[in-house]
Regions:
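Catalytic cores of DNA base-excision repair glycosylases
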Residues: 22-24, 30-252, 260, 265-267, ...
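Residues in the recognition helix of alpha-helical DNA-binding motifs
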Residues: 146, 287-290, 305-307
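N-terminal amphipathic/basic-hydrophobic helices that include classical n-h-c signal peptides
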Residues: 1-12
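N-terminal export signals and maturation junctions of secreted/periplasmic proteins
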Residues: 13-23
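A short, conserved structural fragment
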Residues: 292-304
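Short amphipathic alpha-helical interaction segments
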Residues: 278-292
């Protein structure tokens, strides 16, 4: 029995015509978009096409859960509704707001991106892949997400969840490039925003990593796996193997330091104690050095300060 979903790339193997495959793709997209139109989650960044708002949401959503991002996103845009507004503030102000989201390097990158957007792009978020990926911290995934969700351009946005879903649809393990090629090929050219948001919600709510709800899937007719046999998503495109434990990690220690600095300067001699690394001074020194290199903290007269005084 042939797979329920094939791509033009796979047609080279199966011998099916491109017209047959295009028919299947259009039927799949109709089913997905009809489902998405009725069931999409109500998330604040889905109510706007403002490129700056979309960029902020995508940076915040990197490795951070939706429920933690939502209040920070709303507060961020209330304070800094444009790149120009953020450039009038300080990195330390942004880092204070960022508390609770984790991975503060993203805040530094967003701060630097705002300055580049103002200085190089006249205050307008770029609308090409080539220009977007020149922004600090913006890679191909984030750039594609901005192009789709702000400018409604026909790109596929491949993240961990979507990579898992596409592998199951096609019934095969996918490398990163092939996964992205398939996402770009399958995207509905007339409704790229709705199609990609539908994929996100389908993958996040039904096509789960464990215990997928195959019987409730609105497009199960086109799925090659449907929960039977080995999961083709294992080790496939964009499918993560999970983060290292947070407890006892460098991330936790760095977070303690940055949280303390939101309340004011800290004597450098107290850094190890604040990070709960009194027994590992070498590690504490390395982490402080890393934070300085990333311009997240400044050392001045034997005191640590939040942000970069040279910003």
């Amino acid at each position: 029995m042939r797979p329920q979903l094939e791509t033009f790339h796979m047609a080279k193997i199966s011998g099916r015509t491109e017209s047959d495959i295009a028919f299947d793709r259009e039927a799949l997209n109709r089913g997905l978009c009809q489902w998405a139109s009725a069931t999409l989650r109500d998330l604040p960044w889905r109510s706007t096409r403002d490129p700056w708002s979309v960029l902020v949401s995508e940076v915040m959503l990197q490795q951070t859960q939706v429920n933690r991002v939502t209040p920070k996103y709303i507060e961020f845009l209330r304070r800094w509704p444009s790149p120009q507004a953020l450039t009038q503030s300080t990195l330390s102000d942004l880092l204070k707001l960022w508390q609770g989201l984790g991975y503060p390097r993203r805040a530094r990158n967003l701060f630097d991106s705002a300055h580049r957007i103002v200085q190089v792009h006249d205050g307008e978020v770029p609308n090409t892949l080539e220009d977007l990926i020149t922004l600090p911290g913006v890679g191909p995934y984030t750039a594609r997400a901005v192009l789709v969700f702000a400018f409604e351009l026909p790109f596929g946005v491949l993240d961990t969840n979507v990579g898992r879903l596409l592998a199951r649809w096609t019934g095969r393990s996918l490398g990163p490039k092939e996964g992205q090629d398939i996402a770009d090929e399958l995207v509905d050219p007339d409704r790229p925003w709705l199609w990609n948001q539908g994929l996100f919600d389908l993958a996040a709510l039904q096509c789960l990593k464990r215990n997928p709800q195959c019987g409730e899937c609105p497009v199960q007719e086109w799925c090659s796996w449907r929960g039977v046999g080995d999961d083709p998503a294992s080790g496939s495109a964009g499918v993560s193997t999970g983060q290292t434990p947070f407890q006892g990690s460098d991330r936790q220690a760095r977070g303690r330091m940055l949280k303390a600095l939101t309340k004011g300067p800290v004597p450098a001699a107290q850094a190890a104690a604040i990070m709960e690394l009194e027994g590992d001074i070498v590690r504490a020194t390395r982490l402080i050095s890393d934070l300085r290199k990333e311009s997240l903290i400044t050392v001045q007269e034997e005191a640590l300060l939040l942000g970069d005084l040279l910003q």
